[in-house]
Amino acid sequence: MNTTRSTQANTFARINTLLTTNLKSILKKEDHNADRINLYDAGEYWVAFEKSAYMLDKMIDKSDKPIVLHLKVHPFPIVMQSIHYQRVNDMCKKHIMAKKQLEYLQFLTQRIDPASYNKWYREFVVEKNLI
């Protein structure tokens, strides 16, 4: 197995473990989120979900598109955005880090506009995935 495939497999495994063990707490945190980007360690990448994914998506290169996850254990699609671990260092220079743990980071951001978030969510979940 080459290095790229090995890295991808490791990232996928870490995301799978994260969602298997922490999905409810992640979604609960995102349900009430309005001004923080919650990032979770996934190997070479950090991943954000739902509102955190929206805020992260606004900050990063537009070629990095969010991924819509359809999980058997959750009735609705979940939006995930990722950022390479090296680019998180740039975020540290531009945004206030509220929490730093081994596998979790939280950055403060400007408060999100609910209408803009809903439009973004519909674009990625409904229009592009045709659910």
Positions of PLM-derived features:
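Basic, polar low-complexity surface loops/patches
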Residues: 2-131
